[in-house]
């Protein structure tokens, strides 16, 4: 039993899994890194306070990322296996 971080690309439907991780804390750290990289490297995403977005993701265990028009671009979630 472990935790995985799933990234879903809403445009292609592709799902990428990272893990499994032994603890939820590990998964949350990977989630934080993934969200930070998404905002750093994806020009589609709306300008945001990246630090706040990462903090929200770690707190909630999930993050939806939107473009400037409000369209969902990607979704990150932590799931227990």
Regions found by a protein language model. Give the residues of each.
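Conserved aromatic
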Residues: 21-22
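Short, mixed-charge low-complexity intrinsically disordered segments
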Residues: 33-81
């Amino acid at each position: 039993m472990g935790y995985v971080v799933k990234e879903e690309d809403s445009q292609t439907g592709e799902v990428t899994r990272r893990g499994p991780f032994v603890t939820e804390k590990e998964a949350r750290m990977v989630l934080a890194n993934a969200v930070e990289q998404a905002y750093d490297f994806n020009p589609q995403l709306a300008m945001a306070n990246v630090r706040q977005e990462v903090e929200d993701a770690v707190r909630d265990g999930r993050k939806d990322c939107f473009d400037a028009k409000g369209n969902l671009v990607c979704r990150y979630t932590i799931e227990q296996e």
